[in-house]
Amino acid sequence: KYQPRVDQLVRIAPLIVEMGCFARVETNGGAFEQVNLLYGENPNKAVRAFTAPFREAGIQTHMLDRGLNALRMYPVPADVRRLMYKVKHAQGVDITRIFCGLNETRNIIPSIKYALEAGMIPQATLCITYSPVHTVEYYASIADRLIEAGAPEICLKDMAGIGRPGMLGQLVRTIKEKHPDVLIQYH
């Protein structure tokens, strides 16, 4: 997966704004920050520089967040995660897409609360797969718990591209019937 350096991001941001077709842009998170570090860049300076043109244009920015692992590949203490949301919001990030590859709500719900405390929009994520146990009911019950915890948005994250259109459509209908004000995004 290609991830650009901060100098490339800063050059492309004004062009994205000029296109005039985006309400949201992913600006940082796990992979972005790891690439910054690999290039010897400061990810905190990078996110401030990259989000600035979007903030000025009124375009919301969002980051990817691995729940219990925050932006890393290993668990991060709760106090560090709580602080991370405050820092990211101060740096210009509006939305955090919180996911756990196992859909374990215990790994996602604390991050929803921390993001809300920091003034961010927590977009709780359902990682989609296809198997006999991964039914509409399975995913809808997880969505219910995440929404009850405060998530105003749900993302259906089909990382492997194996989500079945019929099942995904029914899942969206099921969530919207129970939670009509919740925004649902497919990724």
What are these regions (language model features)?
Residues 2-16:
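Short catalytic helix/loop segments, enriched in acidic residues and glycine
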Residues 159-187:
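Catalytic alpha/beta core domains of metabolic enzymes, predominantly
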Residues 14, 23-144, 160-165:
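Active-site beta->alpha loop and helix N-cap motifs at the rims of alpha/beta catalytic domains
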Residues 19-22, 93-95, 151, 181:
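A structural motif
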Residues 143-158:
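Conserved C-terminal portion of the radical SAM core fold
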